[in-house]
Design a protein with these regions (language model features):
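Conserved beta-sheet core of the metallophosphoesterase superfamily
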Residues: 161-235
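Short acidic, glycine-rich surface-loop motifs adjacent to enzyme active sites
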Residues: 141-157
Length: 267
């Protein structure tokens, strides 16, 4: 059964150094098919932070699909922000801003929602990006599980308002739902969340899962550090949350939920 280790908002520059080694060990134990990192590898897009992120990714023995977050775009270096906002990301992490991972049983498509503007960290998608991703999802053979990875979320927990949604979410969801998207992975809020798209978008016959990872940084905003592990088949998806245990200095399984594919989508 394909397995995904999903982490987000590592924020090298503000990473909790005690957590890095146990995190690597946890990923090793899970032995995922691939690792999804939904953005914000750095705190301020500095060279030293990208180098630390690169070293961390190089320690993972599994394929990695990573997309940029708003913190991976320079904030104070205005020349870089205006002229080449993804330059350092491409230099140290990867050239591709919207990578794809594909196997016989799943396809995962990354979408870059990080923007040089506005300055407050909001993200958005444009029609060209979404159409390209939708076409890739549609073209996948043998009806795999279809996954979309962004930094900014398509849905938010009840504690957050709609202003935190990814920009142009209605347009994007409509087209990605038509392409058969099953799972949306994101981060940004530093809050763990699992739900389904039918609550917000109400697209007939479509209900995908929205899965948000917490953070690995010291910017936990009241929540302990977490990662997600997804175990997927065409009819069943299990999502397990691993939470940092301060006393044991390990990540422990803290929550599991199972969803099944129905005629109306995933519930």
């Amino acid at each position: 059964m394909p397995t995904i280790a999903h982490l987000s908002d590592i924020h090298f520059g503000r990473v909790d150094s005690r957590i890095v080694e146990p995190l690597v060990q946890t990923i090793e134990a899970v032995a995922p098919t691939f690792v999804a990192v939904s953005g914000d590898l750095t705190q301020r897009a500095r060279r030293s932070q990208f180098l630390a992120a690169r070293q961390f990714l190089d320690r993972l023995r599994f394929p990695v699909l990573v997309v940029p977050g708003n913190h991976d775009v320079p904030l104070f270096n205005l020349a870089a922000r205006f002229i080449d906002p993804y330059g350092s990301y491409r230099r140290y992490i990867q050239k591709e801003l919207e990578p794809v991972y594909e196997s016989d049983e799943l396809i995962a498509v990354g979408l870059n929602s990080a923007r040089a503007f506005p300055f407050h960290g909001g993200g958005r998608l444009n029609e060209r990006q979404v159409d390209r991703a939708a076409a890739r999802l549609k073209s996948a053979p043998d009806d795999p599980v279809r996954i979309v990875v962004t930094h900014h979320p398509f849905d938010v927990p009840e504690t957050h308002g709609a202003e935190h949604l990814i920009g142009r979410s209605d347009m994007a969801m409509s087209r990605l739902a038509d392409a058969g998207a099953d799972v949306f992975l994101a981060g940004h809020l530093h809050v763990s969340h699992v739900g389904h798209t039918a609550t917000r978008y109400r697209i007939g016959g479509h209900s995908a899962l929205v899965v948000q990872a917490g953070t690995i940084s010291t910017r936990g905003r009241g929540e302990l550090n977490t990662i997600n592990v997804l175990r997927l088949s065409r009819t069943r998806i299990e999502i397990e949350r691993y939470t940092w245990d301060e006393s044991g200095h390990v990540f422990k399984s803290s929550w599991t939920r199972v969803f099944h594919r129905t005629a109306e989508g995933w519930f």
